[in-house]
């Protein structure tokens, strides 16, 4: 008999709506013992079967659902089916947009909670973020090896969230070749170097692909400030769009060095690109005090909020940094501003920008809205999957 997680009375509604998480407060009891990440059955208070998921006793998310089909086992064949389903959509996108790199698996939205897989050329970069994902590591890798024999697999599960589920951080080659120090990929006509082994996340922010392309229509003959530039994707796109100058700011000299290489790799005019190692908050104030002005500002900060207790502080941070950006823009200038914090809703983010404009003493018009690229889908039953949001704002 399988181990069962029994829900408290009335707590089955989210599962009936096919939401993939069971929170600790919804659990009445466990029937049997399960190890960390083991597959369990989830039943309502009367014993009616609801789902099959992965058990995580140390997490507030006590179980993550693998399947709502009682006949479906969680094995190599299961992972192969999920991967093939996900690949169909990526194949269409890759052909349509000429991509050699994309997100293959976007966790819950692809039916594989806690699993992220990015493909960069013939390298699959894996992040296992939950106990269930780690428990199924061998089955997942076996499925990947069968479906993608041409690909090497590299593990970037060096993510702090694993500690919340009682797991160590892991990183390194799994199968095949070690990724080169910098792997070239292509995106909308740009050549970009990706640091799989040491870069942020899996090496590159594929989710901003569409936003980087959209930037080009705003920058012709404009002076651009690229904040939190990382390896310069927005900077290269701005130069390809014909900007007169782009200033890229980041705290990491290593990232700025790669950004410079990316400009050179695309045979763009390096004299139009400036790379500044500094704290963005501090530098924006310095620019304001000096009377510096820009025509376009890209504001793409890291996540400011990890949990609900940090949300108010994050709101203040987003408001402050966008206020400073608005103050630095010429009349008619464009602010391209983003938040990758999942707890920050699009409506709240828009309100923060509006409040920032009031504090800056300027009017803004919202002219375009952004979200994560289409290889980062959001399944209807899991709205939390929509984490990246952004706006193009015209500053009056």
Swiss-Prot record:
GO molecular function: protein homodimerization activity; RNA binding; rRNA (cytosine) methyltransferase activity; rRNA (cytosine-C5-)-methyltransferase activity
Classification via InterPro entries: PUA, PUA-like_sf, PUA_sf, RLMI, RlmI-like_PUA, SAM-dep_methyl-trfase, SAM-dependent_MTases_sf
One of the GO biological process terms: single-species biofilm formation
Domain of life: Bacteria
Cross-referenced SUPFAM superfamilies: PUA domain-like (SSF88697), S-adenosyl-L-methionine-dependent methyltransferases (SSF53335)
PUA domain: residues covered: 2-81
CDD domains: AdoMet_MTases (cd02440), PUA_RlmI (cd21153), RlmI_M_like (cd11572)
Catalytic activity from the UniProt record: cytidine(1962) in 23S rRNA + S-adenosyl-L-methionine = 5-methylcytidine(1962) in 23S rRNA + S-adenosyl-L-homocysteine + H(+)
One CC-aspect GO term: cytoplasm
Keywords per UniProt: Cytoplasm, Methyltransferase, RNA-binding, rRNA processing, S-adenosyl-L-methionine, Transferase
EC number(s) from the headed UniProt entry: 2.1.1.191
A Pfam family recorded for this sequence: PUA_3
Keyword match Oxidoreductase: no
UniProt subcellular location: Cytoplasm
UniProt subunit comment: Homodimer.
Function: Specifically methylates the cytosine at position 1962 (m5C1962) of 23S rRNA. Methylation occurs before assembly of 23S rRNA into 50S subunits.
Family according to the record: Belongs to the methyltransferase superfamily. RlmI family.
NCBIfam families on file: PRK15128.1 (NF011707)
Name this polypeptide is given: Ribosomal RNA large subunit methyltransferase I
Organism: Escherichia coli (strain K12)
